[in-house]
Structure formats: structure tokens, C-alpha cells
């Protein structure tokens, strides 16, 4: 499984608009981890909105509290249990006031821990895995009746067939960019990764279902759509003709939807990057010139131990083909340092591949054994002090590459989608085609506009710019 870790370090509470009246029940959703969890939280909120639940950002006001959890990083479960301890106190205080609070744990920690959550955190009323969110309203109803529920079996039915479509007002409240999950699960079984055990086998949504959801999003004002999957380029969904489509063909179809001006996808596995998908990067102006393509390590010996089933040379040849098709593309990746058995020479191979690719940005982590994965049982675990030193060196190199990429854009003109107000008064923030935050004065246009700007400076992870033209309605 490949996981885009852009939001891995953040935890956000999800505010979802609904159509229920002010007197109806309220739900608070806290989201941990990746973009797919953000999408899942939105869909859970949509399902609950259909049952009269209105979203709130204030946990003290909530009748239902849901933690949508991530299990990728070390101690993920302990972080959840700590949060549940705080929620237990809140639940007890509300009970003294005669106010009922239902507490639920969803996501990958729920799938991995199951009934153990109820044992360790008695304040929890329901535990629900990622494949059964469509059952959430009925599960909540049962929990309100006093039942303790663990719903982590893989559903026979497809949850996407049963989840209600979000209300137009809810979509509008989420902004002009959106996520859309097209693929779930993983069949790769990398030895460091827990996802095949928490998300299950690879499943691809059919074309008609994806297109219908994308059209609804576009009609509600979404201008940039990011397709999500644990291995999104492994997507092979049923087309309208009953035949199997690949991700490249799907992108060509989505590019036909009026109002959708920008397309992205994440996260990909090198083994599933086929010619049709590379052609989409070459031919589709709506497909942004940015690709997150993790390699994890630069040593063939470590790649084999990780069960990646490709070599460093395979990866570099693939990068060459992609760049030949789309010369302006910026590459991103993931790296794990300190995998069991990693030697100094293996680590230098990783540093070499980073220099060879020259990433616009990338994410790097110390290896942490995940219970139940083959890597956790391997010998030659690398000492933490060695991991720390290697990670520091790798991150310094990646930071320098990111800084150089940002500075290379100074003086150029780009099309910028204005997404939201900036942190400072009088500013707006958008995203460059290469995914960097770009800050501009608010007189550049309205949120949802695509404007021509000139990059004036680069600082940290962000770019600064000035207007260079007028707002455009569509590409």
C-alpha cells in the first residue's frame, strides 16, 4: 500500500454542513491521517445528515462523537486511547446533566483493534471499520438503545452503493477542491505496511458511480478533484460497456466534465504506472503536473526485503518515461529509513536515488514495526539512534531540493486556483499546479477563480505572488 502522508501529522475536526433543523442531533468528527480518512469522514457525516444529525466543531455540543483513526504510524492506537480518556470525562460530565453522548471509533485503528477498544475504553459505544460506514446510521441507533457494537467484518455489499449522496449545501461548505475515493484496499503486502490487514483487498468502484459523484461535485462548485486510493493507479473499474477500464482512461473521461478544471490522483505504486496513465499526463492539460510516486528506499536489497517487487533502476527508468511525457512534472515520494537490516551502504543508495530524481517534495519517516506485519518479526532491527541520524541527513537533502524547486519558480507565471482566505487579513491562498500553497492579495479574485499570477518569492513550503492577469472561469 502507498500512503500519501501529506496530512499524516495533522489531526483535524471535520465540520460538515447538513440540512437538519437547529433542534436536531449534533455530531463531532475528528479525523486522523490521510486524505482518504478526510473523504471517509465527509461520507460518514453525509450518511448521518440523512438521519438528522448536524455537524459541529464543538465537541461539548455533540450528541455523537466519532474518531476516524489512522493506523499507519507507530503508537497510533495509543494516541486514540489517550483521546478516548479525555472524551470519557466529557461523557461523564454530560451524563450528570442528563445529556446522552454516544462515542464511536472508526477507521483503521477500529479495524485493527476491534473489541479490544471496548475493553480498554468502556466509554466507547461503537467500533466500526472502513468498509461498513454505510451501516453507521443503524449502528448508531442500536448504540443509542444501549447495545455495544463492533462492526468490523468486511461487508458483502459495496458501501458506495448504499452511502447517500451529499447535499449540495454540504459540498459547497467544503470548498472548491474535493477528494473522491475510487479505489480501496491493497494487494501488494509490503512487509512494513499494515493497510492490507486494515483496509482489505483491492476494490475498484465502477466508472458510472465515480462519474456521477464527480458531476455532483462539479455542479456544486468543485473545481479541483483529487482521486484517492491506497493504490489508486491499481484502479480497474467496470466501464459503461461492461469492460474494465484503467485509471488513465478514467482521467480522460473525468476531464470531459464541465466545471472540473483540475485533476489529481494519489497515491500510486510504481508497478501500476502503465502507458495509458503516462499518456494522460502527456495529453490532459487538466491533469496537474505533479505526481506522488513513493519508492521507499534506494537499495535493491532493502526493496526486496520490503516486497516492493521493483528495483531502483526500474523506478528511475519509470521517472524518465514520465518526464519525457510531461517535462514540467514535479515528483514527490515517500521514504522509510532504518528498515530491518538497512546498512550504511543501503542508506547511501537511498540518498543517491533522491539526488538522481531531484524531488519537488517528499516525505520521510523512521521505520516503526507494525504488529502483524512481516517486518515486525524481522531480525536486524536498526537502533533508534542510527535511524535518527539517517533521517536527519535525508530530510536535510529533501528540504534543500524542495527549497531549490520553489526558488526555481520565482519570476514565472502560473495559473492559481483561489481556495480560501489566508491567515493574514487581506490575503487569499491557493495551490500551484505542483501543490504548493500560494499566497496572494485578496484583490486578485474570488475564491473559486483561476487567476494568472507571477511568483515573486519562495519561503519555506509556500510561494508568494502578485496578479499577472484576470480571473478565468475554466481551462
From Swiss-Prot:
Tagged with keyword Isomerase: no
Cofactor(s) of this protein: [4Fe-4S] cluster
Sorted UniProt keywords: 4Fe-4S, Cytoplasm, Iron, Iron-sulfur, Metal-binding, S-adenosyl-L-methionine, Transferase, tRNA processing
Catalytic activity: N(6)-dimethylallyladenosine(37) in tRNA + (sulfur carrier)-SH + AH2 + 2 S-adenosyl-L-methionine = 2-methylsulfanyl-N(6)-dimethylallyladenosine(37) in tRNA + (sulfur carrier)-H + 5'-deoxyadenosine + L-methionine + A + S-adenosyl-L-homocysteine + 2 H(+)
List of residues binding [4Fe-4S] cluster 2: 186, 190, 193
KW tRNA processing (keyword) present: yes
Primary location class: cytoplasm
Gene Ontology MF terms: 4 iron, 4 sulfur cluster binding; metal ion binding; N6-isopentenyladenosine methylthiotransferase activity
Protein location: Cytoplasm
Region Disordered: start-end pairs: 1-20
A Gene Ontology term for the protein's cellular component: cytosol
Pfam families in UniProt: Radical_SAM, TRAM, UPF0004
Radical SAM core domain segment(s): 172-404
Protein name: tRNA-2-methylthio-N(6)-dimethylallyladenosine synthase
Gene responsible for this protein: miaB
